[in-house]
């Protein structure tokens, strides 16, 4: 028997309804902030991602060669594709551009709880605004989006400028190596690279930077950072809106294109793999032939959000099973259609079962049975049976629809 590929999942109807509900809440949050949804291809030219992240990322991707000999890949993330789309088709649009997306991505890595080879992301990209207000808006939207899902989380907000200021004067390669270890929270690796580069004097200020809990403490450690005014303005805006966050200047987002503000979100009820949000400011469009436009965005790991939320009861919409005699099938289709046109879910028998078997089946899948025997067909009525209480009454079709609709979603 064939099985699904490793690292992928099947979703049965109940789980899909839960996922669609949370997905809809995320989309609604972005819409309220003026963000409009975009969509990019599932596969892109391999170069799109190696230009941004280097050749090393290839081993983590699903790479293939098409029939024309072009190197292609299933997208491992969406930001690069959105900025490629901006360069191709969006440069002339009035800025700032407020875009959002919900998409599946693919990475060839070891599956574990909350981490799959096919996974979904909800994300936002704000393109063309280079201000503290833009940074604050994206962070506040990330906070609003996560809150809309019901997940409980901690929000950490930092900025790369103080850390880069401490590392200024170092070779760019050394800076990247140090920030990579900081990003992974690999203390042993960090100590080794600092010792190997004769940079052990940086260990104490780098550690102190990660312990700072106020903006003023940050500048006591890092010194006079040119971006100080913008950092202070951004944090002041967050505090003015009572955003619940923790200043964290130890964040060292490993992707080279992050330039300033960075932030992360962590689900409170997950274990080691608890990061559900990552974002920051970046400049990426110039890599793809566009202008050097400032951008700020985030991505939410949808699958980990769902793991964090866990199972929950869905609002139940009543379902009607239409039961009929063989002679009443045409009337049954009319009745089912009338329920559907009124916004009520209705199912007609497709298996040519007897009426008793139809009622038994409806009791497993529906809340009401609309019974059409010979008398009901001749009178133009239905006998509506509540399959939970057992109560039943012959009614006009309009009355039956109104009775079911009265129960609504519960």
UniProtKB/Swiss-Prot annotation:
InterPro entries from the UniProt entry: aa-tRNA-synth_II (IPR006195), aa-tRNA-synth_II/BPL/LPL (IPR045864), Anticodon-bd (IPR004154), Anticodon-bd_dom_sf (IPR036621), His-tRNA-ligase (IPR015807), HisRS-like_core (IPR041715), HisRS/HisZ (IPR004516), HisRS_anticodon (IPR033656)
GO terms for MF: ATP binding; histidine-tRNA ligase activity
UniProt subcellular location: Cytoplasm
Pfam hit, one: HGTP_anticodon
EC number: 6.1.1.21
Gene Ontology CC annotation, any one: cytoplasm
Keywords: Aminoacyl-tRNA synthetase, ATP-binding, Cytoplasm, Ligase, Nucleotide-binding, Protein biosynthesis
Residue pairs linked by disulfide bridges in the UniProt entry: none
Catalytic activity: tRNA(His) + L-histidine + ATP = L-histidyl-tRNA(His) + AMP + diphosphate + H(+)
HAMAP family reported for this sequence: His_tRNA_synth
Family, as annotated: Belongs to the class-II aminoacyl-tRNA synthetase family.
Protein name: Histidine--tRNA ligase
Organism this protein belongs to: Methanoculleus marisnigri (strain ATCC 35101 / DSM 1498 / JR1)
């Amino acid at each position: 028997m064939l099985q699904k590929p490793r690292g992928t999942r099947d979703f049965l109807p109940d789980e899909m309804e839960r996922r669609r509900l949370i997905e809809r809440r995320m989309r609604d949050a972005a819409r309220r902030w003026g963000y409009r949804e975009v969509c990019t291809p599932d596969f892109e030219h391999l170069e799109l991602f190696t230009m941004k992240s280097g050749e090393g990322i290839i081993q983590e991707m699903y790479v293939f060669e098409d029939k024309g000999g072009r190197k292609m890949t299933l997208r491992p993330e969406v930001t690069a594709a959105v900025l490629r789309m901006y360069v191709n088709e969006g440069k002339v649009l009035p800025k700032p551009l407020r875009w959002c997306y919900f998409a599946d991505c693919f990475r060839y890595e070891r599956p574990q709880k909350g981490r799959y080879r096919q996974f979904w992301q909800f994300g936002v990209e704000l393109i063309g605004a280079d201000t503290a207000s833009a940074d604050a808006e994206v962070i506040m939207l990330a906070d609003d989006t996560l809150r809309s899902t019901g997940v409980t989380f901690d929000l950490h907000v930092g900025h790369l400028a103080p850390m880069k200021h401490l590392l200024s004067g170092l070779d760019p390669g050394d800076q990247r190596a140090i920030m990579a270890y900081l990003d992974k929270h690999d203390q042993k690796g960090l100590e080794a690279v600092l010792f190997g580069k004769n940079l052990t004097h940086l260990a104490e200020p780098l550690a102190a930077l990660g312990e700072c809990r106020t903006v003023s403490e940050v500048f006591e450690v890092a010194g006079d950072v040119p971006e100080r005014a913008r950092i202070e303005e951004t944090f002041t805006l967050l505090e003015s809106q009572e955003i619940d966050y923790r200043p964290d200047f130890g964040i060292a987002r490993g992707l080279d294109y992050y330039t300033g503000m960075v932030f992360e979100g962590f689900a409170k009820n997950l274990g080691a793999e608890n990061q559900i949000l990552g974002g920051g400011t970046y400049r990426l469009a110039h890599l793809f032939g566009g202008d050097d436009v400032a951008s700020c965005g985030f991505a939410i790991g949808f699958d980990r959000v769902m793991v964090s939320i866990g199972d929950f009861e869905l609002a139940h919409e009543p379902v009607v099973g239409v039961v009929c005699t063989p002679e009443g099938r045409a009337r049954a289709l009319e009745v089912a259609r009338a329920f559907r046109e009124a916004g009520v879910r209705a199912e007609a028998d497709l298996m040519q079962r007897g009426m008793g078997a139809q009622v038994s089946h409806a009791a497993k899948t529906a809340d009401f049975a609309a019974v059409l025997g010979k008398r009901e067909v001749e009178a133009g009525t239905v006998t509506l049976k509540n399959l939970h209480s057992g109560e039943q009454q012959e009614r006009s079709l309009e009355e039956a629809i109104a009775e079911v609709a009265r129960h609504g979603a519960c």
